[in-house]
Amino acid sequence: MAAMEWIILTYDTSSPHKNHLKMVTILAPAKKFMVVITEIFAIIKGVCIGPLDKFPQFPSLSYLKLGHIARRRPMENGGNNMNVLVINAGSSSLKYQLLNPATGALLAKGLCERIGIDGKFTYKPQLEGKEAIKAADVAMPTHNEAIAAVLNALVDEKNGVIGSMKEIDAVGHRVVHGGEKFAKSVVITDEVMAAIEECNPLAPLHNPANITGINACTAVMGKDVPQVAVFDTAFHQTMPDYAYMYGLPYEMYKKYGVRRYGFHGTSHRYVSRRACEILGVPYEDQKIITAHVGNGGSITAIKNGKSVDTSMGLTPVEGLLMGTRCGDVDAGALSFIMDKEGMDGAGLSDLINKRSGVAGLSGISSDMREIEAAVAAGNPRAIMTMNVYNYRIKK
């Protein structure tokens, strides 16, 4: 195994740009290090990674710990040939992809479903001659077993796409809510995990599951593989206060952080950038409206490369009509329902998150394929639901 490297990074934080390299001290012979940060730069307590082109002698810096000292793990599979495992963990599911960012190649993807129940595992290698696994029965009592199943498939002697776990250079995790704490993707440390947990009340259906995925990767892969949190909310941190503040007493914001945060930021950022690439226009000069439409949905206004407004709010419930989420609704209607139904806060959360939206209006399903079939059959509630769904997006 290659020797570990240590380097010290100190940045001139008095600089107005806060990204001027002040000193780099090599404590061991420099080798090739892996990239785990794709943002232009990320500042953590005065220590910064990037912009990488500012110091080409270190083309691929990696794992940064607080305290100005970073331990580096040399790449196992060559300078630009890094592999990143991307994880989107839900409460009972786990989506994954293995990618090579340098080439853009997708090596494999798949899904672990019904974790904690009966376990279904899907694996789709993208290399020629490799066989897929579809909804196989695999015991997954916890996310740890799900991650282990993913890794076993990736390194399988016959149908795997890599030779060993050492060829996975980093893991990227989708984390739904970063609150006001995170405006960029960050390397996961104990401090970062604690901050993510503090945001759990703002995304109780998502953040705990994301944390479970991170912990599962650590348990199965160990702590030497760097992990990065990519936040749904980060892209929207550029919204002005007049776009994100609610008309509630200001104390609610100061005490509890009640404001609009927005979600699907990674999707909106990618789609808007990709649209400009296809159109051949500069991203920083455009006004763009993007739509993320799925079981959850949101609309975002982007000006000069920055999110200036979005349809989701404090939680992913606000905005469009969604699969099981209600979207925009008069807050007074909710207090009215609570009074009439004798409902507590937990009951209300269940109503607006799990029993509303397309499923609640139609009485059929949250699956738009079933709604479309019912519309074709002339079902009046399905037709009404489809009209509401489309109108909310257009509005």
Residue ranges and their predicted role:
Residues 93-140, 313:
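Short glycine-rich, Thr/Ser-proximal phosphate-binding strand/loop in the N-terminal lobe
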Residues 24-46:
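Cationic, amphipathic, low-complexity segments that mediate targeting or membrane/lipid association
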Residues 154-206, 226-228, 234-243:
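Short beta-strand-loop/turn "lid" adjacent to the catalytic site in phosphate-handling enzymes
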Residues 9, 20-21, 27, 56-59, ...:
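Short hydrophobic targeting helices and cationic amphipathic motifs
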Residues 60, 64-81:
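Short, Lys/Arg-enriched N-terminal segments with co-localized hydrophobic residues
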Residues 235-339:
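Glycine-rich phosphate-binding loop of actin/hexokinase-like ATP-binding domains
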